[in-house]
Regions:
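Short amphipathic alpha-helical coiled-coil/interface segments
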Residues: 191-205
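Active-site-proximal helix-loop-helix substrate-binding element of RNase H-like nuclease domains
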Residues: 37-40, 47-54, 89, 98, ...
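Acidic beta-strand-to-loop metal/phosphate-binding motif
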Residues: 77-85
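Short, flexible loop/turn elements at secondary-structure junctions
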Residues: 6-10, 31-33, 85, 138-143, ...
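Conserved RNase H-like, two-metal-ion catalytic cores of nucleic-acid enzymes
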Residues: 1-78
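Non-transmembrane alpha-helical segments in soluble domains
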Residues: 68, 93, 199-202
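Short catalytic/ligand-binding loop motif for oxyanion handling, primarily in non-cytosolic enzymes
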Residues: 12, 86-91
Length: 205
């Protein structure tokens, strides 16, 4: 199982994964067994953590190429994350399609098949992708189904506080775009924190 989280630019409000017009800034994955983390990012980041590997990329195109090479070498049985079904997976798939075409998208699947469909949920249609041969567990969905108490918010930072007693670092700047433009180091640390929290929730559930 790998836990996945991506961050994208947001110059025009919250990015729509179906349109996927904003460039990707980073992808972070954590292997649930080895606990190792790999981050691809388009900026400077340094870490002395032995469990974190950072791949500095020149551009989003470079980032996605490196990510696909790694993915094919270390094909996971299952992807997990927080709202990955409706955000991270469709966003990554749509950017790959936009930049490289349909054939490159097929590289995500051991069977060379990635299928797109529409799902009606929370009062609207969502585009989702099924990566054939790779199971997907969205912990936001599982959490809603298997916990008995309704939460005032299902944001990951709120659930982390409720379930783990952990506070997630917030944005120290006025806007999200200011954050990644001015302090890429803490921005990536935030991205890493996301996969670590989901990994801990996974252990707990």
């Amino acid at each position: 199982i790998v836990t996945l989280d991506c961050e994208v630019k947001c110059s025009n409000g919250f990015p729509d994964p179906k349109i996927a017009q904003e460039e990707m800034l980073s992808i972070t994955i954590k292997n649930h067994q080895s606990k190792r983390i790999v981050v691809w990012g388009v900026g400077k980041f340094t870490t002395d953590r032995e469990d974190v590997t950072y791949v500095e990329c020149e551009s989003e195109v470079h980032l996605l190429k490196e990510f696909l090479i790694f993915w094919e070498k270390h094909l996971p049985d299952c992807i997990s994350g927080w709202n990955t079904e409706f955000f991270d997976i469709p966003y990554i798939c749509n950017r790959i399609k936009k930049l490289f075409g349909e054939d490159e998208l097929k590289r995500l699947s051991p069977w060379g098949s990635v299928q797109e469909r529409e799902v009606y949920k929370m009062g609207r249609n969502h585009q989702v992708y099924n990566i054939q041969g790779v199971a997907a567990l969205d912990y936001l969905d599982l959490y809603k189904k298997f916990t008995y108490s309704a939460q005032e918010s299902y944001r990951l930072d709120h659930i982390a506080k409720v379930e783990l007693g952990e506070s997630k670092d917030g944005n120290p700047y006025n806007t999200f775009s200011e954050w990644y433009q001015k302090d890429f180091q803490s921005f990536i640390e935030y991205n890493i924190q996301d996969v670590e929290i989901v990994d801990k929730l996974e252990d707990k559930m």
